[in-house]
């Protein structure tokens, strides 16, 4: 049974809604300069990146296109399965394009490393922007080109991040209480 008030499942707020909006504005200004005159393909990684992508592109003041991919290394639970699966490929031709991958979080790095290598192999110039970077969780070597917040190695939900498909709609990023997932 789901709780009626999602906030009750949160141990603490790591990044507030106001901080996310402010950081999205800052990143948008940087990305506007980076991609001025280039018409980048802003590639959201479904499903978690949707809130961040929606907030971020409002602050990028240049022509851009958007598309989406679904790649997963989580199959429920709180730990990565280690296996990266391409579930939905990009519809747009990527050869010769500037691509900005938008991700909600970089944890183990497996998903982003896989995606970056796949798109570069297809002839794209790829950069990565992530709302959250969790370097303590890294298993493979990959660094985002642009990052909103560096966070500790805790299981977080909200602003697109989920636990068993719940909590994505929280307007902030918070640490989920262990009793929620240690049942």
UniProtKB/Swiss-Prot annotation:
Cofactor(s) the protein requires to work: Mg(2+)
BP GO terms, sorted: GMP salvage; guanine salvage; hypoxanthine metabolic process; IMP salvage; purine ribonucleoside salvage
Record-level GO cellular component terms: cytosol
GO molecular function, one term: magnesium ion binding
Metabolic or biological pathway: Purine metabolism; IMP biosynthesis via salvage pathway; IMP from hypoxanthine: step 1/1; Purine metabolism; GMP biosynthesis via salvage pathway; GMP from guanine: step 1/1
Binding site for Mg(2+): 103-104
InterPro entries from the UniProt entry: HGPRT, Hxn_phspho_trans, PRibTrfase_dom, PRTase-like
Keyword field: Cytoplasm, Glycosyltransferase, Magnesium, Metal-binding, Nucleotide-binding, Purine salvage, Transferase
PROSITE patterns: PUR_PYR_PR_TRANSFER (PS00103)
Protein name, as recorded: Hypoxanthine-guanine phosphoribosyltransferase
UniProt source species: Lactococcus lactis subsp. lactis (strain IL1403) (Streptococcus lactis)
